[in-house]
């Protein structure tokens, strides 16, 4: 019985030591990398065209094959370009935290850390060229109950092909919010 008590007494020291690097989960293992993504509109494109984005994988996905995405793109009648968070599409989220989008007045390079709050989860978000957006995933790190984050900047629209092109930097490390290239510290 005494060895168990001894081990239990050492646990707080182990947690304290692991927290010395700035994140109690230990160092990040996945580097933040800048990428360029093209999405086709939900309506009016070929069925095989990816029209949604999953922050956790940092990739475009087909919304007809999975609901494991955070937002989708559409070109509405009248020419308005929009991103739609999952809930705006009527997709319920069982993780307890709905994916969201946050329009930013900061430059793409000026965003170095994802905010914790302020994300639009239910509303359609109108987008424009050079618009900067921070995206929050659903709870993909279920063992610790946190989302992952990304920042993106709209580069261009192709109305004829009903596409949007954007650059994205996703931090796919659980518990980290840094949005700068390389291995994040936080």
Predicted feature descriptions by range:
Residues 1-8:
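Bacterial N-terminal signal peptides that target proteins for export
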């Amino acid at each position: 019985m005494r060895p168990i008590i001894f081990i239990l007494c050492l646990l707080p020291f182990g947690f304290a030591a692991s927290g010395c690097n700035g994140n109690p989960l230990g160092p990040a293992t996945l580097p933040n990398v800048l990428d360029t993504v093209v999405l086709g509109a939900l309506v009016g494109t070929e069925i095989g065209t990816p029209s949604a984005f999953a922050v956790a994988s940092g990739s475009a996905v087909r919304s007809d094959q999975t609901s494991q995405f955070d937002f989708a793109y559409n070109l509405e009648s009248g020419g308005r370009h929009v991103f739609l968070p999952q809930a705006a599409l009527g997709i319920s989220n069982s993780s307890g935290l709905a994916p969201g989008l946050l329009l930013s007045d900061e430059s793409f390079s000026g965003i170095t850390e994802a905010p914790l709050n302020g994300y639009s989860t239910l509303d359609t978000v109108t987008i424009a060229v050079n618009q900067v957006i921070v995206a929050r995933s659903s709870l993909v790190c279920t063992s610790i109950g946190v989302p992952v984050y990304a920042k993106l900047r709209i580069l261009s629209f192709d109305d004829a092909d009903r596409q949007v092109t954007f650059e994205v930097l996703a931090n796919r490390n659980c518990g980290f919010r840094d949005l700068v290239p390389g291995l994040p510290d936080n």
